[in-house]
């Protein structure tokens, strides 16, 4: 049975009505700032665009003053944002409605369970499935935290719109509240004045946990267990969703990530989840007013009640309340222990004695608004060291289980549902660490550090000059035969080595105190050899995280370029063959993770080449694991755009090569994608549900493509992809004018100066395309509306194949109909092309200084037109997005506004490059960049 995507159910009538209200309010705010004439100018620009008179539009914008530009840039940036909010509210409404009335939709967990339950190994699948979204700080989320908060206020008001229409809420007050927030938004700085620090990135992401992720993950995990019970499947401790984090641990190309940021990331995460627990326990304290005169309690709960700091005579007969008071006291002590920084009891006590003038224990940080008598007693107990802290989350969980068992034993099981059940579930998922932090560094840094260590220990003077075979021999000898560390406190170290060792020491400390789950992987960027992995092992050995039997941090290679992906098969064959590696993997439950880089492989070889090389690499690596009895699991380094591996998550997962998803999958969530997917608890629940359902679906679905046909399909793809790679590289790396075209006909220079992340736009000074990071590369092509990384080279390659032999078009059409991977591949191109605009791109091309450079656009335009024709022919469609009517309607709402913004951006870039903008006015370009990214929704 086929189900519709939930997005296809959206109510365009309601969205249109809300957009009308929001536009009216934005018009009023604009009129207040710029007068009637200012608003008239804006409306005139929209009319010119609607009429298709782009020359007149360009002329009108060129005649605007810089002051006019200020208002227009804000207007055209904010309206797409307001449209986004309305669409998000409608999606949240549909999520709740369809779940409450038990109506089907694609990816609904209960529907997926029906399929899984029919499998012979249903229990194993459900027990072991684990999907891990990993939040990263890649710089494509350009909104300020303040703007995100305003967005949430408007979101909450729009959620009440249907109640307003039904007369359940006063319309005038609702409208006045909405007007106020739109007015504030119009007069608030949209972009950051200063570049983010790593700490800012960490705290920004933590807001998503507070507002949506903790609630959504807890709810989904509970629903997962409930459905298993409903199907009669007994599970021990399933973890369908856990979270990952790169911020604070990803130092590849980011010199601002240090041991301190790693510790900060871990401790802030602990604070967030402990604050959540403290709040939940407080709620339970308030509600569990059961009297010992009317109900029995277990001896364990009675003992907890005796230890409670709550000695009020009014609660002496309320054992559950006093037990929760005891638990909360321990949680507060635990929180202070982690906030102490060096994880010592003495430091925690000192911090407490300095701050416990109640009202100043940083109670705002610690427990929000819970300053009342009971909390005073809890804090007093903590300050007097009469309450111990929880050394592990398991100990906290045990106390909660004791209360649960007491309720069950005494016929009070009805009280377990609600807050209590949510709290238990949250502890099982998040522990005291909240999310697993990944570490990442470039392989060249590891090599330099190991070379320095080997030289200082008088083992090898010129390690970097050794052959690969010689390097591996040296490294294995140190790992297998010599238990001593290479570093010495008596030998001076380079700044790089000192910094790396400090990070690894901190990782060891965090694992010792917060548990093994807090840091589980270290990723090696640009993995090109086995020695790259053993070099990391040497550094981990220095701090006791690796020995001959066990690696407490798994070594994860990242294969990024086309060449590295093609070589990954041979590299992993060799690596997995070493006895020491076999022992490490055996002690990791026979899992070996491999990260796949979508961004760099795309920049290296184009969309088709990247997608196909990744597909083949997964098949080959999975086979290597199966031959050795090892579960190879993949970490997909996907961005928001198709050019960086993005696209609909459900389709992306269900189109993975058959058999390559065992039970665990990790994938990056970055930039504006985090806000779009997890900005509110309903959207977060839906998107997490999609990930889990898609993974389960791919695990249980039998191969639907005929195996014999698949052999033919692969041969066809090999031929087409080779051609596509050549066409792409001929332009990007072979055309002598392409470099200048990219830097002159796109806002790459302006994007690089945006204050949207702590990491530089390039690892070093940019002298060619290969030196540019993939994110600003893709982001800039999104801004000038060419979207080149998502389609270039596709049209010509397919066209060459079609023209080579009669009937080849029909073969491609058959592949599209029967092969999920191919269908997903082409559907993403369809979506990208729908968001591109060659009229706008033409005007960006005019920014180039010479005719030779501008001529590059003609090459791009010809390929775009060819790609459009070929894709529609293979799909048998007349227009883009025929299978995504909701996205088509969404673009129809927003295109007239953020398309005008592109023309404004072009004019501002002209003025900037002619030195006709002040420093304050330069920020207008950044506002337009923000607005276009907001309108596209997946720009980097």
Swiss-Prot record:
UniProtKB keywords: Carbon dioxide fixation, Lyase, Magnesium
Any one biological process term the GO annotation gives: oxaloacetate metabolic process
Matching PROSITE patterns: PEPCASE_1, PEPCASE_2
Cofactors: Mg(2+)
Catalytic center residues: 138, 603
One Pfam family named in its UniProt record: PEPcase
GO molecular function: magnesium ion binding; phosphoenolpyruvate carboxylase activity
One cellular component (GO) term of this entry: cytosol
EC top class named in words: lyase
EC nos: 4.1.1.31
Catalytic activity, as annotated: oxaloacetate + phosphate = phosphoenolpyruvate + hydrogencarbonate
Origin: domain of life: Bacteria
Classification via InterPro entries: PEP_COase (IPR021135), PEP_COase_bac/pln-type (IPR022805), PEP_COase_Lys_AS (IPR018129), PEPCASE_His_AS (IPR033129), Pyrv/PenolPyrv_kinase-like_dom (IPR015813)
Similarity remark: Belongs to the PEPCase type 1 family.
Functional description taken from the UniProt entry: Forms oxaloacetate, a four-carbon dicarboxylic acid source for the tricarboxylic acid cycle.
PANTHER family, sorted: PHOSPHOENOLPYRUVATE CARBOXYLASE (PTHR30523:SF6)
Protein name: Phosphoenolpyruvate carboxylase
């Amino acid at each position: 049975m086929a189900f519709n995507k939930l997005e296809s159910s959206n109510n365009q009538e309601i969205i249109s009505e809300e957009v009308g209200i929001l536009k009216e309010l934005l018009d009023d705010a604009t009129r207040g700032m710029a007068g009637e004439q200012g608003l008239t100018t804006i409306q005139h620009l929209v009319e010119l665009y609607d009429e298709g008179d782009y020359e007149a539009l360009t002329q009108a914008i060129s005649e605007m003053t810089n002051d006019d530009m200020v208002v227009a840039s804000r207007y055209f940036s904010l309206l797409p944002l307001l449209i986004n909010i309305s669409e998000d509210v409608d999606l949240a409404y549909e999520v709740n409605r369809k779940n409450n009335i038990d109506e089907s939709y694609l990816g609904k967990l209960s529907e997926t369970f029906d399929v899984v339950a029919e499998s012979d190994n249903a229990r194993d699948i459900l027990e072991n499935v684990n999907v891990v979204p990993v939040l990263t700080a890649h710089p494509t989320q350009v909104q300020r935290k303040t703007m995100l908060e305003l967005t949430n206020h408007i979101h909450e008001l729009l959620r009440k719109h249907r109640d307003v229409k039904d007369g359940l809420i006063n319309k005038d007050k609702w409208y006045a509240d909405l007007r106020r927030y739109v007015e504030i938004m119009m007069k608030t700085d949209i972009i950051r004045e200063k570049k983010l620090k790593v700490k800012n990135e960490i705290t920004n992401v933590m807001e998503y946990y507070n507002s949506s992720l903790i609630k959504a993950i807890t709810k989904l995990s509970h629903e997962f267990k409930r459905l298993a019970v409903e199907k009669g499947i007994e599970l021990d401790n399933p973890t369908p969703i856990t979270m990952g984090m790169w911020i604070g641990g990803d130092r590849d190309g980011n010199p601002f990530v240090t041991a301190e940021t790693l510790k900060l990331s871990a401790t802030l995460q602990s604070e967030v989840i402990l604050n959540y627990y403290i709040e939940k326990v407080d709620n339970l304290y308030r509600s569990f007013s059961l009297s010992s005169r009317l109900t029995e309690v277990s001896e364990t709960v009675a003992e907890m009640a005796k230890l409670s700091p709550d000695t009020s005579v009014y609660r002496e007969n309320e054992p559950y309340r006093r037990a929760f008071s005891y638990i909360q006291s321990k949680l507060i002590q635990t929180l202070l222990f982690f906030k102490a920084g060096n994880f010592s009891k003495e430091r925690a006590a000192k911090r407490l004695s300095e701050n416990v003038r109640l009202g100043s224990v940083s109670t705002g940080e610690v427990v929000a608004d819970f300053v009342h008598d009971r909390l005073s007693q809890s804090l007093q107990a903590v300050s007097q060291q009469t309450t111990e802290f929880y050394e592990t989350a398991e100990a906290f969980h045990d106390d909660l289980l004791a209360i649960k068992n007491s309720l069950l034993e005494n016929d009070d099981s009805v009280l377990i549902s609600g807050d209590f059940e949510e709290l238990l579930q949250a502890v099982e998922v998040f522990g005291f660490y909240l999310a697993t932090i990944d570490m990442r560094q470039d392989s060249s840094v590891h090599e330099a550090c190991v070379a320095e260590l080997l030289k200082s220990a008088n083992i090898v003077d010129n390690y970097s000059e050794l052959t690969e075979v010689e390097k591996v021999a040296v490294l294995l000898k140190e790992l297998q035969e010599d238990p001593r560390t290479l570093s010495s406190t008596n030998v001076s170290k380079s700044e790089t080595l000192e910094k790396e060792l400090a990070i690894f020491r901190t990782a060891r400390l965090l694992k010792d105190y917060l548990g093994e789950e807090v840091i589980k992987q270290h990723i090696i960027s640009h993995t090109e050899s086995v020695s790259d992995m053993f070099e990391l092992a040497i550094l981990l050995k220095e701090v006791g995280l690796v020995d001959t039997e066990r690696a407490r941090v798994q070594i994860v290679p990242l294969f990024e370029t086309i060449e590295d992906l093609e070589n990954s098969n041979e590299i992993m064959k060799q690596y997995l063959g070493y006895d020491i590696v076999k022992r490490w993997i055996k002690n990791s439950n026979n899992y070996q993770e491999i990260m796949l880089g979508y961004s760099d492989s795309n920049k290296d070889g184009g969309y088709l080449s990247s997608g196909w090389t990744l597909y083949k690499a997964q098949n080959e690596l999975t086979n290597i694991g199966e031959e050795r009895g090892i579960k190879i699991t993949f970490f997909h380094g996907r961005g928001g755009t198709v050019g960086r591996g993005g696209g609909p998550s459900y389709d992306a997962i269900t189109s993975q090569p058959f058999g390559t998803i065992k039970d665990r999958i990790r994938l990056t969530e970055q930039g504006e994608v985090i806000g779009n997917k997890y900005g509110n608890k309903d959207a977060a629940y839906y998107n997490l549900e999609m990930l889990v359902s898609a993974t389960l679906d791919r695990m249980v679905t039998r191969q639907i493509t005929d195996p014999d046909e698949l052999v033919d399909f692969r041969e066809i793809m090999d031929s087409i992809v080779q051609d596509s790679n050549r066409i792409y590289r001929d332009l990007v790396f072979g055309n002598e004018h392409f470099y200048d075209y990219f830097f002159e006909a796109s806002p790459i220079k302006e994007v690089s100066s945006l204050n949207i992340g702590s990491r530089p736009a390039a690892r070093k000074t940019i002298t060619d395309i290969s030196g540019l990071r993939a994110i600003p590369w893709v982001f800039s092509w999104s801004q000038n509306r060419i979207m080149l990384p998502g389609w270039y080279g596709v049209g010509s390659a397919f066209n060459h194949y079609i023209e080579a032999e009669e009937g080849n078009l029909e073969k491609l059409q058959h592949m599209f109909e029967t092969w999920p991977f191919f269908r997903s591949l082409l559907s993403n191109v369809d979506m990208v092309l729908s968001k591109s605009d060659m009229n706008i791109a033409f005007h960006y091309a005019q920014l180039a200084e010479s005719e030779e450079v501008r001529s590059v656009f003609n090459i791009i335009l010809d390929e775009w037109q060819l790609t459009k024709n070929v894709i529609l022919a293979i799909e048998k469609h007349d227009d883009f997005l025929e299978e995504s009517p909701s996205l088509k309607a969404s673009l129809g709402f927003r295109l007239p506004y953020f398309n005008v913004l592109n023309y404004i951006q072009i004019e501002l870039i002209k003025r900037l490059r002619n030195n006709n903008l002040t420093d304050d006015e330069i920020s207008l370009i950044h506002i337009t960049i923000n607005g276009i990214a907001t309108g596209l929704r997946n720009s980097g």
